[in-house]
Amino acid sequence: MAVKVLVVDDSGFFRRRVTEILSSDPNIVVVGTATNGKEAIEQALALKPDVITMDYEMPMMDGITAVRHIMQRIPTPVLMFSSLTHEGARVTLDALDAGAVDFLPKNFEDISRNPQKVKQLLCEKINSISRSNRRSSGFGSASAAPAAPAPSTLSSRASAPAPAPARAVPSRTATPAAAPAAPTSHAPAHPTTSGTAKRKAYKLVAIGTSTGGPVALQRVLTQLPANFPAPLVLIQHMPAAFTKAFAERLDKLCKISVKEAEDGDVLRPGLALLAPGGKQMMVDGRGTVKILPGDERLNYKPCVDITFGSAAKSYGDKVLSVVLTGMGADGREGARLLKQAGSTVWAQDEASCVIYGMPMAIVKAELADAIYSLDDIGRHLVEACL
């Protein structure tokens, strides 16, 4: 069945181009368009689309307000379009806070110069988020954990929320259908799905994520205490203009410190370094971060596999890695290297993922030592490292 899409934008040119691009995919049908947030709500209620593309700056009602209303009245996956500026990044993070699932930069130049690339990216996003878990899509949604305060009331490190209570997740042995069809030669023992993770003297915590990641990272990191004993590196698929604003937001919300990584930064306990968009991040055995130019041959900039691989080489069995919600399989090969070095790999469970792609790749490859619900990961990190 085709994915039904509602296109919302006050620019007639952009509405037409997005409609043309989406209509060229046989699996997608544009069921309607709207020119402002108010029309978007009316059309969403009338047409019941599978996905909504949403601009931010519109007359009568902006995109963020519209997203909030839509999430309350007819929860629907929303893909936001955002400008490539620091302010655009801030607004996009607010939209994700309101319940949007994902975003794309609104780049008119790319539409003109690279129409095939834009078509592939946009259609891939639409098809993917149409299958997203709406219950897990936003930190502003009804299902959001208490650890995610609203942006208008940013908490200080001293008043960050307490960890969410543990929640049991059915084990793979109890649900055989969820297990991979055929174990491979590198298959570990059945992963843990509840209980306390084994303590180990970890020198680094590495977390990789994509779609749904801004929500998931906030949910996890706000549960960590200021005296968290290990350095952290974060890899979130995100454009260059967005990672600085995202790091700043996390830093305001968390007890630990968070910053966008720069070349030469030194890893230290209680500091999380976020890989800069458009580049690659590696770590060396001296505890120093290396930031490299993004390679155009790679789909992801930053790439989880690259950071995980460097961590495996530099820290051997002393890395605790976590793969959170996201499209595709980035992180799988890096996790394989970590496992070969003796390190630990965790995956987010399907029920709490917005997109069960990256964690599924870890689980299917039999690389996961543990599979945890999003609300439990922060607590387990504390138990494993403190």
Curated annotation (Swiss-Prot):
Keywords: Chemotaxis, Cytoplasm, Hydrolase, Phosphoprotein. PROSITE patterns: CHEB, RESPONSE_REGULATORY. The modification 4-aspartylphosphate is found at D55. InterPro entries: CheB-like, CheB_C, CheY-like_superfamily, Sig_transdc_resp-reg_Me-estase, Sig_transdc_resp-reg_receiver. Residues 4-121 form the Response regulatory domain. Residues 132-194 have a biased composition (Low complexity). It catalyses: [protein]-L-glutamate 5-O-methyl ester + H2O = L-glutamyl-[protein] + methanol + H(+); L-glutaminyl-[protein] + H2O = L-glutamyl-[protein] + NH4(+). One of its GO terms (cellular component) is cytoplasm. The active site is at S210, H237, D330. Its EC number is 3.1.1.61, 3.5.1.44. One of its GO terms (molecular function) is protein-glutamate methylesterase activity. SMART domains: REC. Residues 132-197 are annotated as: Disordered. One of its GO terms (biological process) is chemotaxis. It is found in: Cytoplasm. Residues 191-383 form the CheB-type methylesterase domain. Belongs to the CheB family. Involved in chemotaxis. Part of a chemotaxis signal transduction system that modulates chemotaxis in response to various stimuli. Catalyzes the demethylation of specific methylglutamate residues introduced into the chemoreceptors (methyl-accepting chemotaxis proteins or MCP) by CheR. Also mediates the irreversible deamidation of specific glutamine residues to glutamic acid. PANTHER family: PROTEIN-GLUTAMATE METHYLESTERASE/PROTEIN-GLUTAMINE GLUTAMINASE (PTHR42872), PROTEIN-GLUTAMATE METHYLESTERASE_PROTEIN-GLUTAMINE GLUTAMINASE 1 (PTHR42872:SF3). Contains a C-terminal catalytic domain, and an N-terminal region which modulates catalytic activity. This is Protein-glutamate methylesterase/protein-glutamine glutaminase 3. It comes from Pseudomonas syringae pv. syringae (strain B728a).
